[in-house]
Amino acid sequence: AGLEEGSQEAGAYLAEHDNALLWAGRNRLAAAVKLLDYLNVDSQVGLLTDSCHNYVEQTREGWLHRKGSVSAGHQALVIPGSRGTLTYVCVPGRDTHISLDSISHGAGRKWARSICKSRIDRKYDRNSIRSTRYKSQVVCHDTNLLFAEAPEAYKNVEQVMEALQEYGLVDVIATLRPLITFKG
């Protein structure tokens, strides 16, 4: 099944889709400005990059759904790790055409959110779940979310980055170590 291109239903879906993307972008910007204000940093410093990782885009060849990936059309790409791993700042590599000009948004989940707490509940106490191997702090008031977003719930981002570089999809220009993680 699906939507017929040019139909009223497809038009309505795309309008809602575009509104959702606009809302998400503004929400990310508002969260960033709020954090910068909290840290007493000038929030007019400018935006380095902003990208969605779940959207539909019309290309010359047809419709492309990027789910968990971003467009290689950006000058800078941020490929986040978990709160316990590095985040990578990259530029698109020479061979992005082999992946429909799409780049992984991150390592991806290894476990469903619903099973995380039962798998690692005994590993952490009340305080250790709120810090990382980098000694960074996690700010979150929802215990279930703390477990659902634990580093163990994600695939190995270093292996993902090695593969992306091996296939010529990205060139890493910097890595970022988490200092503080906010979970809403």
Task: Indicate where each model-derived feature is located.
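Domain-length cofactor-binding catalytic modules of enzymes
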Residues: 1-184
